[in-house]
């Protein structure tokens, strides 16, 4: 079945959705702030192709009411993007959050209500070579989609997952999608900021006793927050998670550098949706998070230094 998709934010992840859905014959368009692209070249582990695409800078230019609006902007632009697309969000349009980090789904529900927002856990890596040219570098698992509120029809979500898979982005439906998101928040919060601060890959962080101790502290604090905030989670304890983290999760991605490393060089990261969000949740629920707070401030300091250099 041909569907209509509007992808908001045509960066690394958004470009992948726009290119693969267009190639599969769906009516897909991108919404960008500036510099529209008319072709996307894809290379990497999911194959190589180049395809003409439609992108617009104004929401009024979008020539259809989409079935799905995919939000793939950086976390700090989420609220603005959600409000910007309102004119094309029809009665039967769903918002899909294709971002990692805490707070994006919550913002979407605040604006559009439960039963209107699909949450996804993105775990493939895409790198922008230049605008209109991306490389799919890694895929640790399928994309997971679902509705934490349980209000969206399961068959619709299963069919949507099948649509993405048939388009070339392996996806499955999971009722427990929020647990997958929390899992990714723990992983990203432990690895990304330290990788960005020290400019090293994940394997190096695990091998260095000092960064390993910092990661352990980050994880311990996150689990204290998870318990107090009653966030859904696969793991019963920080120790249970750490065992899997060091033995199973890091080895396959040991050579990987965090995307936050590129972001911090440009002076803007998603730290507020990761460790920064843990700090805020800690304050809300009375949990002390000194390591997460220190790392958040370190990343924000590096952002500021790099902004002054640009």
Curated annotation (Swiss-Prot):
Listed GO CC annotations: cytoplasm
EC number(s) stated in the UniProt entry for this protein: 1.1.1.169
Residues bound to substrate: 100, 188, 192, 259
SUPFAM superfamilies xref list: 6-phosphogluconate dehydrogenase C-terminal domain-like, NAD(P)-binding Rossmann-fold domains
GO MF annotation, one: 2-dehydropantoate 2-reductase activity
Keywords: Cytoplasm, NADP, Oxidoreductase, Pantothenate biosynthesis
Record GO biological process: pantothenate biosynthetic process
Pathway where this protein functions: Cofactor biosynthesis; (R)-pantothenate biosynthesis; (R)-pantoate from 3-methyl-2-oxobutanoate: step 2/2
Record carries keyword Repeat: no
Binding positions (NADP(+)): 9-14, 100, 270
Residues at the active site: 184 (proton donor)
Main location: cytoplasm
Highest rank taxon of the organism: Bacteria
Enzyme class: oxidoreductase
Catalytic activity from the UniProt record: (R)-pantoate + NADP(+) = 2-dehydropantoate + NADPH + H(+)
Subcellular localization(s) per the UniProt record: Cytoplasm
Function recorded in the entry: Catalyzes the NADPH-dependent reduction of ketopantoate into pantoic acid.
Entry similarity comment: Belongs to the ketopantoate reductase family.
Protein name: 2-dehydropantoate 2-reductase
């Amino acid at each position: 079945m041909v569907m209509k998709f509007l992808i908001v934010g045509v960066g690394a992840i958004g470009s992948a959705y726009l290119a693969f859905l267009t190639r599969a014959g769906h009516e897909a368009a991108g919404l960008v702030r500036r510099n529209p692209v008319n072709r996307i070249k894809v290379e990497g582990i999911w194959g190589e192709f180049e395809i003409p695409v439609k992108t617009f800078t104004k929401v009024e230019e979008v020539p259809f009411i989409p079935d799905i609006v995919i939000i793939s902007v950086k976390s700090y632009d989420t609220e603005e993007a959600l409000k910007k697309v309102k004119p094309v969000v029809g009665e039967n349009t769903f918002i899909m959050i294709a971002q990692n980090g805490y707070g994006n789904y919550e913002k979407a529900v605040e604006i559009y209500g439960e039963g209107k927002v699909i949450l996804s856990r993105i775990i493939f890596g895409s790198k922008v070579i230049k605008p209109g040219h991306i490389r799919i570098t890694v895929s640790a698992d399928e994309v997971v989609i679902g509705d934490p509120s349980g209000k969206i029809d399961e068959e619709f979500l299963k069919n949507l997952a099948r649509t993405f898979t048939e388009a070339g982005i392996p996806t499955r439906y999971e009722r427990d999608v929020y647990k997958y998101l929390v899992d990714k928040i723990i992983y990203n919060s432990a690895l990304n900021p330290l990788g960005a601060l020290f400019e090293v890959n994940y394997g190096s962080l695990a091998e260095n006793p000092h960064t390993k101790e910092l990661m352990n502290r980050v994880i311990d604090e996150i689990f204290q927050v998870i318990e107090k905030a009653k966030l859904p989670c696969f793991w019963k304890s920080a120790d249970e998670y750490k065992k899997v983290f060091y033995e199973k999760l890091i080895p396959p991605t040991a050579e990987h550098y965090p995307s936050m490393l590129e972001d911090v060089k440009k002076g803007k990261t998603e730290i507020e949706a990761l460790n920064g969000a843990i700090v805020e949740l800690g304050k809300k629920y009375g949990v002390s998070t000194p390591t997460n707070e220190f790392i958040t401030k370190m990343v924000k300091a590096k952002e500021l230094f790099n902004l002054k250099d640009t």
